[in-house]
């Protein structure tokens, strides 16, 4: 068993760098970073500062602070270390705690009448986590890479919505995604398949929820179902 737990890569500096990358680009930070980018680099920067601070405060509390605190308490109560949650069977409770926080975040944003293209970021992340929980029954997807895929999908979706060229940002975040995926493999937290699978889940969820074309297709499909139901009755 001791041989199986050893790192294949023995370079301690490389392992420390991989750990630092994993901590910096934690999945918890993805929604907050997405909102921050929107408020700084898109036309949403013209919104009142007070409004932006309220939205960022809500997102921070429910997507970073609450999940981090509840998972920390869960670890302390059960005597788990940070690495113990890498085991597939121990990931369900952290997932459920995070999903609960995101649901409360959506409810709060709904009460504040925040536009759909903002709440859609949280909704896409929520769907992504639910899929990860289901897949986790048999396989361990990388949540870090799911978050990276969601960011890239969100960039494509918002570029279509707001009409800007996303190539520069896409190059940056694709590079970050590659570094992050490599770090997860170096730390032996995931295989290449789990890294690629997580990225695909995040990318698809983000595009389906946020991209205007997908929303148009869903709307047309709903109209088709309504018309078909009317004719049948």
Predicted feature locations:
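Short, Lys/Arg-rich, polar N-terminal cytosolic tail immediately upstream
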Residues: 1-17
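The first (N-terminal) embedded transmembrane alpha-helix
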Residues: 21-41
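Membrane-interface helix termini and inter-helical loops of multi-pass transporters
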Residues: 42-50, 80-83, 111, 215-225
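Loop-to-helix transition at the N-terminal end of transmembrane alpha-helices
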Residues: 48-64, 88-89
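Juxtamembrane helix-capping/reentrant segments at transmembrane boundaries
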Residues: 81-97
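Core segments of transmembrane alpha-helices
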Residues: 97-106, 147-152
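Membrane-embedded catalytic cores of phosphoryl/pyrophosphoryl-handling enzymes
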Residues: 115-225
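Conserved small/polar residues in nucleotide/adenosyl-binding loops
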Residues: 230-233
